[in-house]
Amino acid sequence: MIPEEIKNFLSHEGGSSLIIQGNPGSGKTILALELMDAFLDCNPMYLTTRLTTDAVYRYFPRLRQRQKEINVIESRDTFWDKFFAKADSNELRVERDAFEMYGMLDDPDRTDIAEFDRVCDRVDEFLPERSLLILDSIEGLCDKYKVSEKFFVGLINRCLIEPAHTKVVIVLEKMEKTEIDYLADGVISMHQMDRNGRRMRMLSIDKLRGIAINQPNYLFTLKNGRFRSFNAFKIMYPEEYLPFEPIPNTKTHYSTGNRDLDEIFGGYQIGSYILLETGENVDNFFYTLPMLTAANIVSQGGSAVILSVSGAGPSEVKNNVFEYGLSDRLNSFRVVTEENPEEPVTEDFVVAYDKERFASNSNILDLELAKLRAEQGGDVVKIVDYEILETMLDMQALKRTILSDKKYTAANKILTIAICKHSIAPEIKKTLANISDIHIRVNKYNDTMILYGEKPTTSVYVIEPDVGRGYEDVKLTLMR
């Protein structure tokens, strides 16, 4: 997916120039090729000094499949002795006399630019329709033609952009500001970033003349050799709700309830303690991850105990259960919540305790879990948000509770998912991280939600809502 702002920029009337700049390996060429693929109706041409045509097809096989639509032109050192008269000034045209001016320059080291004859012919043939020309890279072309980048961009503007309304994309192999940035109508920068040893990629829209920039920065991936950017995170709901599709557990592991998460972590081992740590400004949508695990276990005859918090209180859990088509299994859930005299408990799946009693008897969750297991049988998952426990217990009592939970989980061969939010004390975070079997981080970056494993270490994945199965799920895309 190409950012909407870039598509709008290349779709508006008239000619324009767009610079794609970035250090080597940042994905500039792949984006340029993706633009050609997206604008096949614009007579796309790819002028390159990097590779031969065969090499381009070898590295980007989809271009070979598009040979009729996309023309790959290699920059070679040949002579150009063919010039044409200027057409009527009111008509769209290729201004070839600009190249004639270049040919008259008294420079013994000059290289003739014969491949532009092919470019001009192709643009001419396509008029009055507009064409798209990719120059990859301008440094390579200018080095070959022995001209400055400023001169070359001016030449392209005089010859193709203004008179023929050609769209020209210029690949630039550097990040610092240059004089041609001011000549171009649009500039985008591509970045590779390191986050704790994990690679992330970001595209920044520096300017797009005449286009509103609603999202100036996009995370993107180059997975499978294709460019794909990610929009700001937005919750989605299915048009029609369908029953939850369980993923079978094994003798040794519980499924996470999500196929992508299972592929990354191999499921959750029976008796394991899972830490789900969230960063600042992460939406409550992240509760979908533990709720998928709970739905998967309950749908296979198990049960779930959940310590209620604002993001997953009794009403939210009930809504999830009904949306997953598990209304007949509602009593396989047990939501433990703080007693509220103004909202008396009327549901069998809700258990309310006053705060003082909870503080003096922190194993209430385990007692409820044992009751539920005796009633329902099967596997059990316990979901605990330590934000509420932190308000009830002092530091040392909370640490003892964490260690007790870890031992109880392993001894009783259940699954515990501990939720640790950004606001929790660093000492508690450290204790949870140390005793966890799997440690997953969920963060928000440029309004896009990401996930990665601290234990075991994984790459970064972008979290997107997925309602394709008829219920709230997530899709995880590797950032490569």
Predicted ranges, named:
Residues 2-5, 12-51, 255-314:
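Glycine-rich P-loop/Walker A and Walker A-like loops and their local beta1-loop-alpha1 context
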Residues 56-58, 180-182, 286-288, 315-320, ...:
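A short acidic (Asp/Glu
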Residues 18-20, 45-47, 71-73, 169, ...:
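Hydrophobic/aromatic beta-strand patches that form the interior of the parallel beta-sheet core
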Residues 108-182, 187, 355-435:
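P-loop NTPase motor core
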Residues 168-226, 413-480:
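Phosphate-binding/switch region of NTP-binding enzymes
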